[in-house]
Amino acid sequence: MDVFRRNINNIFVIFVLLHLIIWTLVPTLTNQNLPLDTIEALAWGSNLDWGFNKHPPASAFFLEVLYQIFGPQDWAYYLLSQIFVIISFYYVFKLANKILKNSIFSLISVFLLEAIFFYNFTTPEFNVNVCQLPFWSVVVYYSWKIYHNKKIELKDCILVGMFAAIGFLSKYLFLYLLISIDLLFIYYIFFKKTIKFDFKYLIIFEVFIVLLLPHLIWLHNNDYITISYGLMRTGLEDTSYLDHIKYPVFFFLKQIGILIPFFILIILLVKKIKLKINFKDKKLIFLIFINFLPIFLMLITSIVTGSKIRTMWMTPFYLFFGVLFVYIFQSQINIKKLNSFLYGFLFLFFLSPILYYYISVSQTNKRTDYSGKEIATLVERRWSKNFTNEIMYVVGDEWHAGNLSYHLNSRPKWFKSIKDKIDNLDPKGGIVYTGNPDILKEVCPGDFGKIDKQGFCMIGSKN
């Protein structure tokens, strides 16, 4: 155990490297195509803007940066996901060290996250949920510094504002964390009056708003399409009175189900669970606000609006659950008797990639089995036989047209539709439309083809 104690930082590094290697290799070796959300964001990235019809721009931006470096190499995007995950683990570990003052407990706080499938099984698909993770953890970490330290550093305020903006530009649900942190400070400044208001707090807001301005302008100019999509996904248009009860209950039960492996590890860690909660403990109050309040606000949203909260939306919400539960039960954890916990952790750590591997190999009708590269090769070969110019644009849904944009050598820009955009396109550029083969065949003015039940209309310059 002394060796274990002395080498905690080394163990943490080994753990995150193993996590990164395993969760980069397994999907790389078993998936034929990138997942839907990753292809979708890559499609947006081919034609970067300050927002898109479904989400803000951050996830597309990070993927496009990587594409410019590595091109259509699938492993790079699985690696990107894991980099985002281990950055979040790092800041969880850092905060745990500051709050728990015990490096072994801090390591356990991170190990517990391997029991939540949001941080392993679902991470190969880089999307807006994974994109939030590092910014969620960084905002919490620097918010703690502002909350805990007697002297507020300007640097910390700037960092909170900056990373809060990037988190919000990843997904609007990041706002639930920001509201929770705001309520924490409001509680202590205006009700408990144990924290004095500091004008440096305004720096956070100013940095946040300045960084959001381009997106807010884009949002206004595009009829708030991203917000409309988000509301549509909640099913608000067809809500009934029963939904105000049904969906919150479903939401609550799903969260319990997700956390069952986590609670099993807690039971293995703490032999006799005795709750001793001191609501005057500022560390505990901070952890409650950043862990439970965002989830509670989601539950209230579902109750008030009758909206359906989708499971994957909760991806970043549990990042600091390990820190909270270890803090609550720290006096009941015997660090000399961790064997059962470590066995449970190792079992879950290796079970998750094994299950992913099995599902990926045994099921052959998934999005990740799509022959995107082969289809792009066929399209490119046919294009070369019929046209002399380069494919500069692909038009269609994010999946079929997005795969073409990703796999074609020319990296054409993706458009859902080019209606009202014709004047902005390069007249020398070739266009490939994807869609319903029966419709495309009738209206295609160029070369029509059909691959895997999908129609392709190619319009370019002839010899």
Identify the residue ranges that each predicted region occupies.
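Transmembrane-helix motifs of polytopic, lipid-linked glycan transferases
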Residues: 79-100, 115, 137-142
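Short periplasmic/luminal acceptor-recognition loop of GT-C membrane glycosyltransferases, typified by
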Residues: 178, 365-422, 427-434
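Hydrophobic/aromatic-rich transmembrane helices and adjacent perimembrane loops
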Residues: 47-48, 303-337
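Membrane-interface transmembrane helices that cradle and orient dolichyl/undecaprenyl
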Residues: 98, 139-156
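Membrane-interface alpha helices of multi-pass inner-membrane proteins
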Residues: 47, 156-172, 183, 208-210
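Short acidic/glycine- and proline-prone juxtamembrane loop motifs at membrane-interface regions
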Residues: 121-132
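Signature aromatic-anchored transmembrane alpha helix within multi-pass, membrane-resident enzymes
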Residues: 331-359
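Transmembrane-lumen/periplasm boundary regions of multi-pass, lipid-linked membrane glycan transferases
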Residues: 166, 178-283, 294-295, 299
